[in-house]
Amino acid sequence: MRTITHIVLHCTAGGAQQKTSDIISYWKNKLGWNKYGYHWLISEDGSAEHLTPDSEVCNGVKGYNANAIHICYKGGWDGTDTRTDEQKKKMLELVTNYKTRFPQAKIVGHRDLSPDLNH
């Protein structure tokens, strides 16, 4: 298993009802990525898709991916926290699980690690 130093929280910066297939298509076709952007993607009903195995690196935050777990919720279009209660519950469940497994890991938001503190 990789050494996990960060648990990074994200929003898709899109509508809460985005289709996962559209998000994946954006990564592949627009950004040219051959890996997914997150380990977990949480829909507005609180269901979560495990997109990338924990043992694998994904494209969450440049420079931090080798040692991070990335958890994202669908939403956050206007830069505000648009999580539903169900998304908050699932995110807390996932973060709690990972923090138990990797107690040394820092919990941060994507913007805390990006150079301009905005992307």
Question: Which residues does each PLM region occupy?
Answer:
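Cell wall/extracellular polymer interaction/catalysis modules
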Residues: 1-39, 51
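Surface-exposed beta-strand edges and their flanking turn/coil or helix-capping segments
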Residues: 22-24, 63-66
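Divalent metal-coordination and catalytic microenvironments
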Residues: 40, 71
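Basic/polar, cationic surfaces and motifs that engage anionic cell-wall
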Residues: 1-12, 44-48, 53-54, 64-67, ...
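Flexible, surface-exposed loop/gating regions in the mature catalytic domains
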Residues: 57-61
